[in-house]
Amino acid sequence: MMIFTGCGMQSRIDDNKSNDAYSVVDDYGNVLQFDAKPKRIYAGTLSIEELLVDLVSADRFVAISEDALDGNISLIKEQATHVKKVVPGYIGVEAILALKPDLVIVQETRNKEFIDALKDTGLKVMVTRVPTNLNMVQNRIDIIAKAVGEEERGNQIVKDMNKKLAVVQSKVGKIPEEKRKIAIAYSLMGAFGSQNGLFHDICVRSGLRNGAALAGLERGEHLSKEKIVSTNPDILIFPQYSATKKGDVNKLREDVLSDESLQTVKAVKNKNYIIIADRYRYSASQHMADAILLLSKQAYPELYVND
């Protein structure tokens, strides 16, 4: 049997028959009882699929989403091809029931009525919160690893993340707060990055100061041009591709850099910008560590010249 890893696939022995019964409590206090490791798993969102491919073998997926096969937004395109059945990114209760899963993992972003309807079918449903920081991401890895009976593998994934984070800390840890570069990130909807969002934690852990948070941006809002000017970022971060809204990301970048009202901004004057794929900017899986390392390397390339 084969199990996915971040760099490919690796052989391992999977002895489900010897597994004892166990139970797991999800983020909402629901107790899930297992007689054996689940073998027909359905994940309701891409970030959970990204985790699962490093936890279980392809034949333990009952299906995988079309999103997982889209290299613009997915970090697991190659691994996802090993799952036989492909379904749309969001499917209804009846379609999930027809898959006959023995474990359904959904995120709280699906509405309560949908989740309740899933539970009413008798399916085993695990509900997870949307991670907004590294601790929440790693806690979710722990709980999902336990649910699929792969706690040891989950522990290793977290250890691997921490090794990457330690590399970043060794490079940027000694930079005084006031000397850290200020960055402002753009989506097609505008400058974003509230202090309560996942990107803020990615930004800060990479050694940057999040300009949107410094300007007091609230969750769900976008930063005004006046705030961008007063924050005066050293770096602008643009998307390589937008997973959230249709539009021309190249035109977005050109419009911002040529905007007359932004010409006093350091990042605009110096044409100092970074382009990062959405699959990293919003990474809520083990790949959050990769996103932090990638952003840090692009923001402070001089610190990584010998790596």
Where are these regions (language model features)?
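Short secondary-structure boundary segments
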Residues: 45, 108-109, 130, 239-243, ...
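Extracytoplasmic ligand-binding site segments that recognize negatively charged/polar headgroups
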Residues: 113-114, 129-143, 177-201
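Alpha-helical, coiled-coil/dimerization segments enriched in small aliphatic residues
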Residues: 70, 192-220
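Short helices/loops that flank or line small-molecule/ion binding pockets
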Residues: 91-101, 120, 223-232
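Structured C-terminal subdomain patch of bacterial secreted/periplasmic proteins
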Residues: 141-148, 152-155, 159, 240-307
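Short helix-initiation/N-cap motifs at beta->coil->alpha
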Residues: 27-29, 83-94, 131, 216-225
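A short, structured surface patch at a secondary-structure boundary
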Residues: 43-99, 103-108, 208-211
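Bacterial Sec-exported substrate-binding components of ABC uptake systems
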Residues: 4-50, 152-183, 298-307
